[in-house]
């Protein structure tokens, strides 16, 4: 499934529990690297609650931020994965 998500040309939204979110990001980073795809990940954690957090960047960067957050294992995660847009230069 991760390979399909990493290779998708469309945004994918995933809802993950606190127990699976870190592993999901690790597997996504590996799949994107394997496919040679650049993806952007946006993570929203604990929406509308006290410890609400947002992260955005490459899977590796977001994973590092989530792992460094002392509240990272609280609540649910909404993860949006989309292909990185290539900027055309003229």
For each of these PLM feature ranges, what is it?
Residues 1-8:
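Class I SAM-dependent methyltransferase SAM-binding "motif I" and its flanking Rossmann-like core
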